[in-house]
From Swiss-Prot:
This is Nucleobase-ascorbate transporter 3. Keywords: Membrane, Transmembrane, Transmembrane helix, Transport. One of its GO terms (cellular component) is plasmodesma. The lineage of its organism: Eukaryota, Viridiplantae, Streptophyta, Embryophyta, Tracheophyta. Residues 1-30 are annotated as: Disordered. It comes from Arabidopsis thaliana (Mouse-ear cress). PANTHER family: XANTHINE-URACIL / VITAMIN C PERMEASE FAMILY MEMBER. Belongs to the nucleobase:cation symporter-2 (NCS2) (TC 2.A.40) family. One of its GO terms (molecular function) is adenine transmembrane transporter activity.
Amino acid sequence: MVETGHHHQHPPAPAAAGHPPVPSMAMARNMGTTWPPAEQLHHLQYCIHSNPSWHETVVLAFQHYIVMLGTTVLIANTLVSPMGGDPGDKARVIQTILFMSGINTLLQTLIGTRLPTVMGVSFAYVLPVLSIIRDYNNGQFDSEKQRFRHTMRTVQGSLIISSFVNIIIGYGQAWGNLIRIFSPIIVVPVVSVVSLGLFLRGFPLLANCVEIGLPMLILLIITQQYLKHAFSRISMILERYALLVCLAIIWAFAAILTVSGAYNNVSTATKQSCRTDRAFLMSSAPWIRIPYPFQWGTPIFKASHVFGMFGAAIVASAESTGVFFAASRLAGATAPPAHVVSRSIGLQGIGVLLEGIFGSITGNTASVENVGLLGLTRIGSRRVVQVSTFFMIFFSIFGKFGAFFASIPLPIFAGVYCILLGIVVAVGISFIQFTDTNSMRNMYVIGVSLFLSLSIAQYFLANTSRAGYGPVRTAGGWFNDILNTIFASAPLVATILATILDNTLEARHASDDARGIPWWKPFQHRNGDGRNDEFYSMPLRINELMPTRFL
């Protein structure tokens, strides 16, 4: 890989009257080495358009599939049972999610951002779905199976209509216009909070079965970071494939605990978190089944639930935006231009439309965990992620095989997520290097946006009941769903706060250099930087076939 970063180092400003003098460069050198800003991260082994060998690509792609599987199973566990679904319904929902994730990921890497991002499930849709479940949980159905299907049909209808929010703001360039008033000051909290806001998927989920979750976390750190230095001959293998090796070891350990009867006399919640013999999932999954349109029946369109989904669509757009910026750093690409982010949000809307048609349980968003995997392995190849879509689609069709891997206990995934999500946080913080890190104004914008976004989102989540009732409780249920969904999302709150503060707080007096605008501006226009086409142009002469707004 070739480093192409531009390194800028400005001379120190003269000291103002009444202020202590700025240390000279000689004094700074005596204090130790300083590192100039670098557009690309060091030590990446493969960038966005460089590829490992095919056998390495296949193994790395399977690793991406395993990482996204955890959140897929988690959201199915969260929503299917409250809907009235049985283990067979859960297996079919997981198959549908995997199938659509494969389709949407392939579309995004081909004609979306073209970054190596996996498009997985979005938890932003959980609150609106819980609202639908609540409305149908009043004994009006003859059986739980009937209630499940009716709920899924309503979710389908709501997803289909709400998808046009993403399509309109994306292909209508409204989202691109928002990105154009961004600066690195705004990107720092947006990217960092995309990961920090998922802290419940880390140690709290791990602690549900600490005897397998904690060993997974510790073993992965030791194997991937320490042993590679002790065993230099296999250091590359440990760095790239330690996740699969450690997961297999801890999964086998969990199976031994299960078979030995360690969980025979524990609570039901502990059994669900720790045991590996989820026979209900294996036995209920069909050998071969291809998800098809309207598999649950004709979609039901209900205005109150459709409006509730609108908020989730906006939240998912903010989540994906933060993930795209993180992926660009970890793939060795320049920051995605505004028109690229906008078209990807529009394509994300098309993905939600397809998910509504095929009967998925939520909309999609860019997977934070899989972007963290780019940093863990130091491989940002687009081809690896594209090949991973084969595994998603294959295991969605051959259900028994998919159910086998879906039986991995969630605390094992949580141990992995503790590391992957932490990497994305650090990537978000790295954007601060392009700004004046000694500016109190910049510190104020970043600090307040970070803290308040997490604090507000945590308040809304902590005060939301299992039935989906949030802190906003007016007479309009659809209005409640929109506000509760928006403010329960740390990334969207961070986007709102940072954008307002950075563009209004001393905006006329703060220099563009201090805000990082000279570095940022070339990436916000189609022809602003010559490398934009290198990373983000469409393949196979698609540019000549599609209208400009779709490019």
